[in-house]
């Protein structure tokens, strides 16, 4: 009782301090590359979320407003940003570079709320735009330095072309099996051509060093469009490896959201999936403004978990500053004036002792707060300092 609903949690001061540490570093990278921050509503009309037909309605937490309009909590930032660009930024010069830090909500077996940060590059297509998005992501990861991070690239059109040979609903089941790397489900699926089954199983082996994967893939029967997509992957991996970005190819990679049209990618670190993204050239057309787009989202909770063992994150809430202690009831006005004066320094943190602690109790409390100095203020305005760094 009196706990948050299953799937959501309180962020306590230390959680917030660590989250802010991550967000600030990501925002610095976003700004350096010219991405401007945008904040979209947490609630969207269901028709907005449904417009592309690519978001699973079962994943959306739905409600109605007082007028009976069906609303949904955003399950993904990208459709909301696409809607904003197609409407509020319709006349903006292209390409539009946007960044965000926001919470998203998904309903699977239980509601979930989590935080994401990412960028969207809208109005530019092709391999150069894909490269920019990947390089922004790589710079974010270099800034944070999570352990053993790897960028995993895939080609959604290449993979879908094999699935397109299978009719629904078997196609949906096979797509899910590929997303979950479930070979058994593919073997068990009845009523599909054995040659197609063999090709789908072969895709599981098309993962690893780019040269090896591209060599194996070149032996498959492919359309010109598929060969062009693999050629772009070869170009991208060459550029990334030239910048010492750890990258592998995975031609079995598929994503939960069905709006991706070309490049797709994931990033893992410390054995966890910490981000994903890709190209979505048809999404903005769903909102009346056709334009290519690409972007990525990093999961802030996952980043926090992989960074914790590294010791990079703050181990305590923001420390330093002053604990101002009035030396008796007659010193209150002088203590308030002293605290006001201290707060004039940029970024200074000042707390006032409110519970009458004195002497060693005040020192112990200051240490618990992480204060640098306990300052007693006397009725005449004079002060006495205890430097906690000296006495520890």
Swiss-Prot record:
InterPro entries (alphabetical): aa-tRNA-synth_II, aa-tRNA-synth_II/BPL/LPL, HisRS-like_core, HisRS/HisZ, HisZ
PROSITE patterns for the chain: AA_TRNA_LIGASE_II (PS50862)
Keyword Cytoplasm in record: yes
Pathway: Amino-acid biosynthesis; L-histidine biosynthesis; L-histidine from 5-phospho-alpha-D-ribose 1-diphosphate: step 1/9
A single GO BP: histidyl-tRNA aminoacylation
Subcellular location: Cytoplasm
GO CC annotations on file: cytoplasm
Keyword entries, A-Z: Amino-acid biosynthesis, Cytoplasm, Histidine biosynthesis
Main localization (coarse): cytoplasm
Self-association and partners: Heteromultimer composed of HisG and HisZ subunits.
NCBIfam families given in the database record: hisZ_biosyn_reg, PRK12292.2-3
Misc note: This function is generally fulfilled by the C-terminal part of HisG, which is missing in some bacteria such as this one.
Name of the protein: ATP phosphoribosyltransferase regulatory subunit
């Amino acid at each position: 009782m009196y706990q948050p609903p299953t799937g959501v949690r309180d962020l306590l001061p230390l959680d917030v301090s660590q989250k802010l540490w991550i967000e600030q570093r990501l925002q610095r990278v976003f700004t350096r590359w010219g991405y401007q921050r945008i904040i979209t509503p947490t609630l969207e009309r269901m028709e907005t979320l449904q417009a592309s037909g690519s978001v699973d309605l079962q994943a959306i937490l739905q409600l109605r407003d007082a007028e009976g309009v069906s609303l949904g909590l955003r399950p993904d930032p990208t459709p909301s940003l696409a809607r904003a660009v197609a409407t509020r930024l319709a006349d903006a010069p292209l390409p539009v570079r946007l960044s965000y830090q926001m919470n998203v909500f998904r309903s699977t077996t239980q509601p979930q709320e989590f935080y994401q940060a990412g960028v969207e590059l809208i109005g530019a297509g092709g391999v150069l735009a894909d490269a920019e998005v990947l390089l922004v992501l790589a710079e974010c990861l270099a800034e944070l330095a999570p352990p053993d991070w790897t960028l995993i690239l895939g080609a959604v059109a290449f993979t879908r072309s094999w699935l397109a040979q299978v009719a629904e609903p078997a196609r949906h089941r096979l797509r899910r099996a590929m997303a979950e790397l479930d070979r058994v489900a593919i073997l068990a699926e009845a009523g599909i051509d054995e040659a197609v089954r063999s090709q789908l199983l072969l895709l599981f082996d098309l993962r690893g060093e780019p040269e090896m994967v591209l060599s194996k893939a070149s032996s498959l029967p492919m359309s010109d469009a598929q060969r062009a997509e693999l050629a772009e992957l070869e170009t991208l991996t060459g550029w990334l490896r030239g910048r010492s970005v750890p990258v592998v190819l995975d031609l079995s990679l598929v994503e939960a959201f069905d709006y991706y049209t070309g490049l797709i990618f994931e990033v893992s670190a410390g054995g966890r999936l910490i981000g994903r993204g890709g190209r979505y050239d048809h999404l903005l057309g769903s909102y009346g403004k056709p334009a290519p787009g690409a972007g990525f989202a990093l999961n802030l909770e996952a980043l926090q978990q992989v960074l914790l063992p590294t010791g990079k994150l703050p181990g305590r809430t923001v420390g330093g500053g002053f604990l101002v202690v009035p030396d008796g009831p007659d010193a209150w006005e002088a203590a308030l004036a002293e605290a006001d004066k201290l707060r004039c320094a940029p970024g200074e943190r000042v707390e006032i002792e409110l519970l009458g602690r004195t002497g060693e109790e005040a020192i112990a409390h200051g240490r618990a707060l992480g204060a640098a100095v306990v300052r007693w203020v006397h009725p005449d305005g004079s002060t006495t300092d205890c430097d906690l760094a000296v006495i520890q």
